[in-house]
Amino acid sequence: MSIRAEEISALIKQQIENYESQIQVSDVGTVIQVGDGIARAHGLDNVMSGELVEFANGVMGMALNLEENNVGIVILGPYTGIKEGDEVRRTGRIMEVPVGEALIGRVVNPLGQPVDGLGPVETTETRPIESPAPGVMDRRSVHEPLQTGIKAIDALVPIGRGQRELIIGDRQTGKTSVAIDTIINQKDQNMICIYVAIGQKESTVRTVVETLRKHGALDYTIVVTASASQPAPLLFLAPYAGVAMGEYFMYKGQHVLVVYDDLSKQAAAYRELSLLLRRPPGREAYPGDIFYLHSRLLERAAKLSDAKGGGSLTALPFVETQAGDISAYIPTNVISITDGQIFLQSDLFFSGVRPAINAGLSVSRVGGAAQIKAMKKVAGTLRLDLAAYRELEAFAQFGSDLDKATQAKLARGARTVEVLKQDLHQPIPVEKQVLIIYALTRGFLDDIPVEDVRRFEKEFYLWLDQNGQHLLEHIRTTKDLPNEDDLNKAIEAFKKTFVVSQ
């Protein structure tokens, strides 16, 4: 076999022509200190704030402190495998999470990785967890109601689509139950719900997921969980991951409800990170930007203008108080950012008033704009009646003789409190709420004994299902009250069949 020189030279020429020099440039630094979930690295001079970096063992980190001669990095995972002298390299990516329809019905961590054992999440789209809130001209005022199915909220402190309503109270006052009931009530309402559990026990999150599954609510819900055993950076990132997943749907013109349970734990995690990064502490040892931590999160809730698709993102942030002190640092911060608050009181909870909503301290700064016409008409005086009752109740304890008008107010108040009580995980459609509150405010319950009011309500709903469908349908379709004579006749007809307990 002879070697032909021209063939060899042709091959060499071809290889020279096709040669591509692919030089990969990457910024690499060195870990100079590591511990408590924080690493300091030298040599990453061009890293961006919030950029993802990768350690030699594959664990990711996020650059938070950009100092003169080193970078403070929070480690998003176990830090025991990282040691001094290890290599750390830039990725050029800002922290982002997977988004899309594939996440619905799944339980994921703040990095978007599934933790429910149902295999990988099949989605290719991502969104950065930090993104600017919609501008002034991109928004529209809140005008559509978000029905929670809880009488005390829908009547006294209504929530609208695109609103931010704080739920505040001590531990064990039913905050999570309010959120779960609201999510369950969004069935058939064309709503995507996102439940963000921050620093909760894993057993608690499991219970919530099972409750949602049992009521068929997991079909439109994403659960994001950063449990108490996770590193502080994941607790800090969880709410931003949740809102990024929600924004994907909002900008597509859909309606989203995001529950943050709870922001006190996120604030504590952020305080921990800030102190470990040696940022100067302020009041209660929180860093100076703790207000911005929550404001930039909650400002991303909005009702978009029609030009932007008309989608909405409603936020229900939770804050846990200590011994009912709503004037502490984090509660006052979040109250000033949100459009109202629902204050749950432990005294009411333990006295059997559940949901334990304090009508005096709870407000909705959107108010009537987030109620249907029918509810506005019947619930107008309800808050005043309740406030007057609470005031008179204090006087009545002294046992002095009361005039007829005061006795009537006390009797009406006691029945109002009974009507506003509600069992767990049993949200009530708004049309039925309107009719029972109409019966209450128009005096139809005044001659029913207080202990029979709950039974009256239950039997009234059953009676309406059989004999009052036309009234319910009227409220459902027109959002207004039916003819008052028809209503009065229907309630009187039911009262004749109702048997008072002896």
From Swiss-Prot:
Catalytic reaction(s) noted: ATP + H2O + 4 H(+)(in) = ADP + phosphate + 5 H(+)(out)
Feature type site, description Required for activity: S362
Pfam families tied to this protein: ATP-synt_ab, ATP-synt_ab_C, ATP-synt_ab_N
Database matches in PROSITE patterns: ATPASE_ALPHA_BETA (PS00152)
Residues the record lists as binding ATP: G169, D170, R171, Q172, T173, G174, K175, T176
Domain of life: Bacteria
Keyword hit for Ion transport: yes
Keyword set, alphabetical order: ATP synthesis, ATP-binding, Cell membrane, CF(1), Hydrogen ion transport, Ion transport, Membrane, Nucleotide-binding, Translocase, Transport
Root EC class: translocase
Region (Disordered): 115-137
EC annotation from Swiss-Prot or TrEMBL: 7.1.2.2
Subcellular location: Cell membrane
GO MF annotation terms: ADP binding; ATP binding; proton-transporting ATP synthase activity, rotational mechanism
Record text on subunit structure and interactions: F-type ATPases have 2 components, CF(1) - the catalytic core - and CF(0) - the membrane proton channel. CF(1) has five subunits: alpha(3), beta(3), gamma(1), delta(1), epsilon(1). CF(0) has three main subunits: a(1), b(2) and c(9-12). The alpha and beta chains form an alternating ring which encloses part of the gamma chain. CF(1) is attached to CF(0) by a central stalk formed by the gamma and epsilon chains, while a peripheral stalk is formed by the delta and b chains.
Its biological purpose: Produces ATP from ADP in the presence of a proton gradient across the membrane. The alpha chain is a regulatory subunit.
Identification of the protein by name: ATP synthase subunit alpha
Gene: atpA
